Amino acid sequence: MTRHYARSKSNERAVDSTPVNTPCSTTILSSVRLNGQTAYTVYHGGTTAEQFAEYLKSILLPTLSKDDIIVMDNMRSHHAKMVKKILDASVIRYLYLPPYSPDFNPIEKMWSKIKAYLRKVKIRVATELPNAIDKAFLTVCPSDCSGWFSSCYCVR
C-alpha cells in the first residue's frame, strides 16, 4: 500500500518512490469489539463464502459469548446460505446493516487506522506483510473502539 499524501518543505514538491510491480492481493477478514479485541485472518485472493464460513467457525465464533451480536455489511459472502446456516446453529445473534451504510459500521473506521499504518511502514516484500499486519492490529486500542462505536451510534 502506498500513502496518498506527503509533507515537504514550503514551496518544494513532496517526492517518494513506489515499485511498479503488481503483487497478488492479500485479504484480511476481521472483527472489532467495543473492548478493543479483534479476531482476524489473512490469506491471498478475494473473499468467498467458503472462506468467510471457515473464518466464522474457526476464528470468530469461538471467541464470542451468547450476549454478543455479529453485525455484517452486505458483502455477498455474508449472505451465503452456508454462512446463515452456521450462524443460525450458533447461539450468537446476527444482523445486517442497511445497504450503503458504512457510517454505521465501526469496522470501517478500524480499517482506516490499519491501512494508514500499513501505508506508513511501506512494506514492499510479501514475507514482511504478515508481521506488519500483526503490528497494525496491535495499534487498535479500547479507546479507539469506544470512539468508533460511539460515532456509529452503536453506544449511547
Predicted regions and their residues:
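Short beta-strand segments
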Residues: 68-72, 96-98, 150
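Short, basic/hydrophobic alpha-helical segments
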Residues: 51-69
